[in-house]
A protein has these predicted regions:
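Sec-dependent N-terminal signal peptides
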Residues: 16-18
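Cell wall/extracellular polymer interaction/catalysis modules
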Residues: 33-113, 128-130
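N-terminal secretory signal peptides
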Residues: 1-9, 20-23
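Short, cationic motifs built from Arg/Lys/His that form the positively charged side of catalytic pockets
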Residues: 11-12, 69, 167
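Boundary at the C-terminal end of the N-terminal hydrophobic targeting segment
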Residues: 29-31
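Exported/periplasmic cell-wall-interacting domains
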Residues: 56, 88-96, 108-189
Length: 189
């Protein structure tokens, strides 16, 4: 009798497990047929600064437009990684070596001529403030019109959404701004 109870018990477990599997199968099959969804998140592929620069100097920033992440190294080698917004198209993207030439603690915004050409409804000028597209801080690069800056529109982070600049959450640009001296080496890849 004891042997029979054990076999009944194992048959019950088998039947119960089969029932559970049948209940789960439709949702598993449905998940396989859905198209993949592109998420608003960065892959945070990281780089080694030594692959791009000879020395840390005053610090290093590498902005990766593929992984949509900014890496910052301070002079002591401490690394920080942040999600970014990147240019909407490759035509708007400038890549290569540059550096920080000016730190703007309250950026105002003047759309570039090409931005105004693409969208004539843009204002000619916007003073510093909560609606300013450059956010609360801006780091100017040697390339005209190119910046690393904050953004008031947090939906842009992790996406191709800028007209050429690298955008960060406002709280992140404040951190980067505080650690970044003029002369910091920058590479956009």
């Amino acid at each position: 009798m004891k042997e029979r109870d054990q076999s009944l018990l194992s048959r019950r477990r088998f039947v119960g497990g089969l029932g559970t599997a049948m209940l789960c199968a439709p949702s598993l099959l449905r998940a396989e047929t859905l198209a993949p969804v592109r998420r608003n998140a960065s892959s945070f592929r990281t780089h080694s600064w030594q692959d791009h620069f000879d020395t840390l100097g005053k610090g290093i920033i590498i902005a990766d437009t593929i992984s949509r992440a900014l890496q910052q190294w301070t002079t002591d080698g401490t690394m920080f990684v942040y999600p970014t917004s990147v240019p909407m198209t490759d035509e708007l993207t400038r890549r290569g070596y540059t550096e920080i030439i000016f730190k703007d603690p309250e950026p105002d915004w003047t759309p570039t001529p090409s931005m105004r050409e693409r969208d004539p409804t843009l204002p000619a000028y916007m003073p510093p403030g909560p609606d300013n597209p450059l956010g609360v801080r801006s780091l100017h690069l040697t390339w005209q019109y190119y910046r690393i800056h904050g953004t008031h529109d947090t939906r842009k982070i992790g996406r191709r959404s800028s007209s050429g600049c690298i955008g960060l959450y406002n709280e992140h640009i404040i951190e980067v701004f505080e650690r970044t001296p003029v002369g910091t080496q920058v590479k956009l890849i």
